Swiss-Prot record:
GO terms for molecular function: phosphate ion binding. This is Phosphate-binding protein PstS. One of its GO terms (biological process) is phosphate ion transport. The lineage of its organism: Bacteria, Bacillati, Bacillota, Bacilli, Bacillales. Gene3D superfamilies: Periplasmic binding protein-like II (3.40.190.10). The complex is composed of two ATP-binding proteins (PstB), two transmembrane proteins (PstC and PstA) and a solute-binding protein (PstS). The keyword Glycoprotein does not apply. Residues 23-46 are annotated as: Disordered.
Length: 325
């Protein structure tokens, strides 16, 4: 299993409407002069961060529109591979099979770590016995092996567990499957809407669910967080500090994947991506998540600028060759 360390809201509808798709109408790139659009799709976990970023962006870029849906990480990558989007929001790293499909289509991309998150396990606020769980106990619950709380711990009530999970289109599902389930199938009530998962746990006294830290923070008056106990007996809970330094057992990075072609050919996309990295995680914190270390943003911004500079120099050489002909 892969452990991530030191990598660098409002309730949303079916899509975070920030603008239209994928074109560049020109402009100098300075504030109001920048015109065009860029389109994304992907993680509902990342969506609140993109919404906060766009609130800041739109103040100075009224004619440069950014749109991003929240159909889930997997669904986002499907559209990214199909050529329907300029960028893809993800709450997990891109899979090998997704990389292969992009490679087969000749699509190159940049991966940007824009924030950090901790997948939070929560039970109903009236649950007075579940304070911590091991990954093994979580696996028993979500594989269906443990059907009652007594099956998890003999001192707990003999009451049926109501386990809920995101569906397989979500990166949070993939992350949990890898980090907790050891690739075993998740046998629980599944829902595409994270807010519906939160609601299910709040309404059912025997409920348990998992979701991004932001969703717990927004609903902590109605939920009870469960700490994670590792094999050595160390207990950790999700806090901004433990998520950022990677000591929380279910911490993870959050990503935006941007197509090289869009970065090179669409000024709106390249300027927005620079804006995201220059923000240094402030929007992530505003959305209830955790910023990556500043050096993470700086190194990625430097790499992006180098990439764009090389592209611009290459374009000038091509233009010169055309003139010489």
């Amino acid at each position: 299993m892969k452990k991530w360390q030191l990598v660098g809201t409002t309730v949303l509808g079916a899509s975070v409407l920030l603008g239209a798709c994928g074109g560049n109408d020109g402009g100098s790139g300075d504030g109001k002069d920048l015109k065009g659009s860029a389109k994304g799709e992907g993680s509902s976990t990342v969506a609140p961060i993109v919404e906060k970023l766009n609130e800041k962006w739109a103040k100075d870029h009224k004619d440069a529109k950014i749109s991003s849906g929240q159909a889930g990480t997997g669904a986002g990558f499907q559209k990214f591979i199909a050529g329907e989007t300029d960028f893809s929001d993800a709450s997990r790293p891109i899979k090998d099979e997704e990389k292969k499909k992009l490679e087969d289509k000749g699509i190159k991309y940049h991966e940007f770590k824009i924030a950090q998150d901790g997948v939070t396990i929560a039970v109903n606020k009236d649950n007075d016995f579940v304070k911590e769980l091991t990954k093994s106990q979580l696996k028993d619950i979500y594989s269906g092996k443990a059907k009652t709380w007594k099956d998890v711990n003999s001192s707990w009530p003999d009451k049926k567990i109501n386990a809920v999970s995101p569906n397989s289109s979500h990166g949070t599902y993939d992350f949990f499957e890898e980090e907790v389930m050891d690739k075993q199938d998740i046998k629980a009530e599944k829902n595409a809407d994270t807010n519906a998962i939160v609601s299910s746990v709040t309404k059912n006294k025997e409920g348990i669910g998992y979701f991004g830290y932001n969703f717990y923070e927004q609903n902590k008056d109605k939920l009870k967080e469960v700490k994670i106990k590792d094999d050595n007996g160390k207990v950790t809970e999700p806090t901004k500090k433990t998520i950022q330094n990677g000591s929380y057992a279910l911490s993870r990075p959050l990503f935006i994947y941007a197509k090289d072609k869009s970065l090179k050919d669409n000024k709106v996309m390249s300027e927005f991506m620079k804006f995201v990295l220059e923000d240094e995680g402030k929007a992530a914190e505003d959305a209830g998540y955790v910023a990556s270390p500043k050096k993470t943003y700086k190194s990625q911004l430097d790499d992006l600028k180098d990439f764009l500079d090389k592209h611009q120099k290459s374009d000038k050489k091509d233009d010169k060759k055309s003139e010489d002909k």
